[in-house]
Each structure stands twice: as structure tokens, then as C-alpha cells.
Design a protein with these regions (language model features):
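Core catalytic alpha/beta fold that binds nucleotide/phospho-ligands
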Residues: 1-143
Length: 143
């Protein structure tokens, strides 16, 4: 479930199809002062700086924040544990609207396989940034 100014969304699935879903929506605006420093890893700062320079019309910092929110929302139902903003390192593909979240802490086991990452998709349109993660129930490896 997610909501922000002018937008609300929920996602549901059968447990036999998906083991977890993470969904977040944010306004496509720059993050408030000092928020970025609280959430960004050194590796993320490198790609973020590059994308903000190459494509300044997009709020890449907000996309990073949204992706981390989706990671947490996918993580918590599997573990029942808190995941800090710096406990996952996000990489973004600007070309195809995907992102990967590499877990920097031990991940949960799904179907006997320990997850080391989550794969997600993102979209920026109509003043919103939306990110989503869906882990299939038949996952046979890291996702």
C-alpha cells in the first residue's frame, strides 16, 4: 500500500503466486534537505550524481528514496524485522526502468533460498515516481 499527494495504490496477490510485494509512490520532487545524506550509500551517491547531471529533469534522489521504501515493504513481511535505509544498496537502470537492491545484511530465506537482492521496476510520470518489487513464490534464486 502507498499514498502521497494526489495518489493512492494497493497491490494484492495470491500467496501461491507472490511471497511479497513492495510498492511506493512519491512526488517527483527533490528530497527535503538532509534526507539524502540519511539514506544514501557511497556507491549510490556515485550513480546518483551521474544521473542528476545527465538528466536533471528527473528527481533521481526521490527515486532512490522510493526504491528503498519498496525494498522495506517487500522485506518486512518476510522477516518481521526493521531494515535501515543503508542496509540495501540500490542500482538504477535509467534505460529500462528497473532497479536492483543488493542486501547489505543477511537476507530472508524464500523456498529454501536465501535472498541477497530484490529486483524492481520504476516509472516516473505525471509528477509521480512509483517503484515496485514482486518476489515470485517459485523464486529459485536471488531476486
Amino acid at each position: 500500500m502507498t499514498h502521497c499527494r494526489g495518489y493512492r495504490a494497493a497491490a494484492v496477490a495470491r500467496r501461491r503466486d507472490l511471497v511479497t510485494i513492495g510498492l511506493d509512490a512519491e512526488p517527483d520532487d527533490a528530497l527535503p534537505d538532509r534526507v539524502l545524506d540519511a539514506i544514501v550509500t557511497a556507491g549510490e551517491r556515485a550513480w546518483l550524481t551521474e544521473l542528476m547531471t545527465a538528466q536533471p529533469q528527473m528527481s533521481w534522489d526521490r527515486l532512490l528514496f522510493s526504491a528503498k521504501e519498496s525494498v522495506y515493504k517487500a522485506w518486512f513481511p518476510l522477516t518481521g524485522r526493521w531494515l535501515g535505509f543503508k542496509d540495501a544498496a540500490i542500482t538504477v537502470s535509467a534505460a529500462d526502468g528497473t532497479f536492483t537492491a543488493s542486501l547489505l545484511v543477511p537476507g530472508p530465506a524464500v523456498n529454501g533460498v536465501t535472498l541477497t537482492s530484490f529486483a524492481g521496476r520504476w516509472l516516473a510520470r505525471n509528477g509521480l515516481v512509483v517503484t515496485a518489487i514482486a518476489v515470485p513464490a517459485t523464486s529459485s534464486g536471488p531476486t
